């Protein structure tokens, strides 16, 4: 299975959070939104954002806010495709785990 509960899950959560804002969103807000579903430090999250940008799943732009620049992250078409793959993988994964917990899968 491609989907695991480590890096891929965090990538999926970040892409889902960023995809909610059509014009993109900034790092601190992404951190807060991700923390609403999974505990994560900024020192963990920013390398994920940089990697997703390097992988062309996210693009960035800077905009002035309160006298300083704020970096915004926006999902790309490649990022949307990756997010859709993660959604399918998550559905398969969570269905199997639910069946296992309910006793419906023979080991």
Report each predicted region and the residues it spans:
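Short, hydrophobic-biased segments on the C-terminal half of alpha helices
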Residues: 46-51
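A general structural signal marking secondary-structure boundaries and capping sites
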Residues: 22, 56, 101-104
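N-terminal helix-turn-helix DNA-binding core of bacterial DNA-binding proteins
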Residues: 2-44
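Amphipathic alpha-helical dimerization/coiled-coil segments
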Residues: 84-107
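Accessory beta->alpha helical hairpin/"wing" motif in late/C-terminal subdomains of nucleic-acid enzymes
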Residues: 75-80
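Beta-hairpin "wing" of winged helix-turn-helix
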Residues: 55-69, 74
């Amino acid at each position: 299975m491609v989907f695991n509960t480590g890096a891929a899950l965090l990538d999926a959560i970040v892409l889902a959070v960023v995809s909610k804002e059509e014009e993109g969103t900034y790092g601190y807000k992404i951190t807060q939104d991700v923390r609403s579903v999974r505990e994560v430090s900024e020192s963990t999250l920013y390398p994920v954002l940089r990697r997703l940008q390097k992988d062309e799943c996210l693009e960035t732009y800077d905009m002035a806010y309160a006298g300083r620049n704020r970096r915004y992250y926006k999902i790309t078409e490649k990022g949307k495709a990756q997010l859709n793959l993660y959604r399918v993988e998550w559905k398969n994964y969570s269905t199997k785990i639910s069946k296992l917990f309910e006793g419906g899968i023979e080991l």
